[in-house]
Regions:
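Short amphipathic alpha-helix segments
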Residues: 5-26
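Short proline/glycine- and acidic-rich turn/helix-capping motifs at secondary-structure junctions
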Residues: 33-38, 68-86
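Extreme N-terminal starter segment of soluble prokaryotic enzymes
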Residues: 1-2
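Short, low-order "capping/linker" segments at domain edges
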Residues: 77-100, 111
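Short, intrinsically disordered low-complexity segments
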Residues: 27-63
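Short, low-complexity S/T/E/D/G/P-rich linear segments that nucleate or cap local secondary structure
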Residues: 102-116
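Short secondary-structure junctions
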Residues: 21-25, 62-67
Length: 116
């Protein structure tokens, strides 16, 4: 599963995320970063909501309560800032239909081939 961490101080947050083992998460890989946006591949059986909850708890426990950050999923190769909106509605929104993508299926496929 791909999630996106957006934070100015993402290196410290990634350090905190990666220094623990999590039940249900086999591995965490960094695909790429674009400015403060870090695209992560999570090898897991957990859903997006539980991954985010787990990571936020871990960051909070390690002193990250003062950090400003957010996690997002991906929809139609774009960062899904509107997770609360139905997929049917998203399919009508210009943002999700633009040709400029945040993480293409090809980029993800190429990354997964490299990790195997």
């Amino acid at each position: 599963m791909v999630i996106v961490l957006i934070a100015a101080r993402y290196k410290k947050l990634l350090e905190w995320i990666n220094n623990r083992n999590y039940e249900g998460i086999k591995a965490i890989y960094k695909i790429k970063n674009v400015g403060p946006k870090v695209f992560l591949y999570i090898d897991t059986s957990l859903d997006l909501k539980n991954i985010i909850k787990t990571f936020k708890k871990s960051i909070s426990e390690q002193g990250g309560m003062a950090y400003v950050y957010e996690f997002y999923g991906i929809y139609n190769e774009k960062i899904d800032y509107n997770a609360y909106i139905s997929n049917k509605t998203k399919d009508t929104m210009r943002y999700y239909q633009t040709k400029i993508k945040d993480l293409t299926d090809k980029e993800l496929h190429d990354f997964l081939l490299k990790t195997q």
